[in-house]
Amino acid sequence: MSLKGGTAAPAPMAPPRKWYDMTSAEFYVYVVAFMCGISIMMPINAVFSAPSYMLEYYLYATKDPFLVPKMTNFWTNVMTYYNLISMVTSLVVEPLTLLKSFRKIPMLVRLLGGLSVLIIEIIVLMVVPARGTTEAGAVATMCIAGFIGGLGTSIFESTVYGMFGAFPPSFTSIMMGGVGISGVLTSLIQIIVKAALPDTYEGVKKQSYIYYSLDVGIQAATFIALIMMRFNSFAQLHFGDLGGVKSKVDAGSLAGAGENVREPGAEATELEQYTEPAIGQIQEKNAEAHKDDPLAERELSEEESGDSRAVEAAGEAPTSNEILRATSVFSVLRSVKWMFVACGFNFLITLFLFPGIATGMFPESKWFATVAVFIFNCCDVLGRFSSAFRITWPRRYNQRWIIVAASFARVIFVPLLLLHSYHYIPSEAYGYVMQVVFGLSSGYIASMALVLGPQSKGIDNDGKRFVAGTLMGISILVGGTIGTVLSIMTQTIRETY
């Protein structure tokens, strides 16, 4: 397996900027990246954190605590069905976000629109029980909420991954850390609430309201933080089209597009020695390097050429959205294919085994599943944050195969956790230890693939980095959907035989 490409490797990355060298604008973007990571997973984490409420949602929707359900198969597997509906919807919708017509939509509109849809998902789950309905209505509510969640996630997730893919890699690491923290936060609250409130009809209802209110509050805070991003100078330098009509990203004249960014015309600092080349400088360097190379890819698609000529004819620097529309999706996919595969297979294994198989072997235990999920989430977030430290990166570009190999090596967890699930290894302690290794490996590989994908050979401008980030998000959905389907099949066979 070779990770070599036909284009030159990207310029060496700048060392991470020290915290005391950050501007307030740069720090704010880190905070927003972290909040976006939390918001991506908060709805599904809030839903999964109240399993008793979801498994007996028909009782609360019908306002009848003694109702005997008719659709027992659906309610027994409601969490899996909900997740599957959400992921299949995302899998269908997210690739559509790469269409040229969708890429014309302003970045801020996409972010706020996707976030608003995620808020609606939780509101639907809370409003229906307040108004009351039938069991069939409760089933329909679950399906509709799952669809709404998948729609919102596909729009918001693809835009967030894409946008921060155009920033230095440390921002993607922080964003991925936020995704992991979301799970830790909800698991921690689940433990506290579970210990404080009884598992009665009213107690479970209060638990669900706490989780859902927390979710809506975090989403609302992220919504406001994203609106303020349009006035952030650091954000506009890296990705100008955040709502301001006049904000332009010059593809060739940015004074530093790496970890150290300064305003055009500002005096250079001693940190300048670490700064990566600007986008235009990278393009000029690549063009010079390949001018005599007959194998170098020079051709643009007809669509790309048309957009490029239109931008040049306008006589002004292209905006990020204009660069984005002029980007070939398939050429970017060729550049990130190995990180795409590593990321997708990693989530296939994770969602095949977690949470159903990895935590469902002791259904009579009140705490095993709760504690196991908490351990997994904590270790997952540690793995995700590890990509913020360069010591955990492959030392050279041609050593990226290590990430791919590590992703495929996680297949070893399949027999180890299946044997535990079938009680051939009947030990709760074994389950906790496995969650540590399983969580660390899942978080590390996911984060490294998402960070390294947009840093691949041939990814040398904002548009390509955005598309690369979006493709990595799609790889999560592809792997996750396949893993979820395999999980349903495995558990169905287990119940039958």
From Swiss-Prot:
Localization (cell): Cell membrane
GO cellular component: plasma membrane
Bilayer topology term: Multi-pass membrane protein
Cytoplasmic side: 1-26, 99-107, 157-172, 230-337, 383-400, 454-465
Membrane side Extracellular: residue ranges: 48-77, 129-135, 194-208, 359-361, 422-432, 487-497
Main location: membrane
Function noted in UniProt: Nucleoside transporter with broad substrate specificity. Transports adenosine with high affinity. Can also transport hypoxanthine, inosine, uridine and cytidine.
UniProt name for this protein: Nucleoside transporter 1
Organism listed in the record: Crithidia fasciculata
